[in-house]
Amino acid sequence: MKQARTKESLYEAATMLKRNALDIVAPLDQLVMSRDMRTLTAGDHVGNLTPHAFAQLCRHVDVPVDYAVRCRDSEYTQGAENSTFSRAPLMAQQIANWLEHPVKNSMRLMRGIDPGEGRPVDWRAFLSNRYFPLDSFDLLAMVLKCCQDVEHRFGKVEWASGDINQNEMFVKLVFPGLRREVKRSARVGDVVQWGLYVENNEIGLGRWKLKGFVEFLVCTNGMVSSRVVTDREGNPLVTDKRHVGATLPLEVDSGIQWGDEVYAAAKQLQMNMIEDTIGHLLQPDKLEAEIAVFDRAADSTQSSNLEVTVQRLAETTKKTIGMSDFEQRLVFNKFFSDGDRSQFGLSQAICSQEVARGLDYARATQFEQLAYNVIALPERQWSTLAVAA
């Protein structure tokens, strides 16, 4: 079920994660895996390997992840008395050998969370030493500062929703001064608010992202825009960026040294990029362009068979986010009950509260992105979904 955090709750969690973050760059031959394959020692720090970090480590030393997991979690019997033994030590010995004699880049960045008080670290990621560790706290602080800077133009930013864990963060913000009506919508007084969608991933599964976010006030749902944003000269702006930077300095015991001038400059460059992108995303003409898209979708061809339309949509998502049978049913039920058979109606069903309640927050956010992709489909592509063959 989709459950969002308040601004205060998310900010507190982001602060705690940054305070407890432990980033260590170490040579592979200084890493020691335990015989049960569940902990890893780096310098003076002993930590539990999360499933994600364990998989990243296995892939780096070219050990099949599924095979390593089976060895770690299974046993075998031996001898006349059928004594039981864990397979983990055998696999751990093989991995230890690859760590001691690496065939790839021998330097890795270990990203951990150190709870303190003598408790073990949680190793959450095993990454290249060129990975740029931009913490969610830093990204959020920059975004909120930028929002405060435009308060005199668009009003005080409003918190639409957000969520965070030790791996990723999602934030959706809107401005009361960026409101417009979708005049062709079947819903009377269908007003939207424009703002920002912010996403960050800290464990190598993605990149930071800044997109436009639109909230529909009639039903309090929203969409994440995938529109290409350009500057005044028409050049595409950076709205997402991989976490890659200069090679990080080795500091096995005390972690990455943030005083390094080159790295500090690289971090500031990222912040400047974020600030510039936000400034362009919040221009009123960006909202006007989206309103034109929504009005066109509201006036589009009607679906001749709602169930077939949803099924065809699900087919198109197979190579991206996919849609389970359960999710298709949620979307169809809302599409049917709303009575709006247009392109606009399907997009609203996809990102509706009724659908979101059946999903976790990250999955609901994917559906908000899908909803925008549907509402922005060219007429010919929409017709392939809407019109019966």
Describe every region a protein language model picked out.
Residues 126, 168-169, 314:
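Long, C-terminal folded domains that constitute the functional core of proteins
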Residues 1-90, 161-162, 174-389:
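Intrinsically disordered, low-complexity regions enriched in serine/threonine
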Residues 104-105, 138, 173:
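Extended low-polarity, hydrophobic cluster-rich segments
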Residues 76-95, 99, 110-116:
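Extended non-catalytic scaffold regions that mediate assembly and binding
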Residues 45, 123-135, 161:
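Conserved aromatic-histidine-acidic binding/catalytic patches
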Residues 152-178:
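Beta-rich nucleic-acid/ligand-interaction surfaces
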